[in-house]
Amino acid sequence: MTRDEIEKAIIRIFTDQFEIVNPGLDDDLREVHEFDSIDAIELLREIEILLGVQLAREDKKAAMDIRSINQIVDYVVRLDGKTE
């Protein structure tokens, strides 16, 4: 997937699953949209579905400090590169 395709998919997940419409790419999701740890776990599951893989524990731990859409997209780009 290209970065643009991943970005669109992540934004669609936020709209469909979390009812966060048009999030700013650099918004602090925790502060601006009250995105919490339960949401983060759900997002990781959606990323697994998107990529068609089960994430390793290390990959999940690496996601815990992510706070913005841009950071999520960077994370998924790295994961997508690992699965190819």
Q: What is the role of each PLM region?
A:
Residues 2-45, 49-84:
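Phosphopantetheine-dependent thiolation modules in NRPS/PKS and related acyl-activating systems
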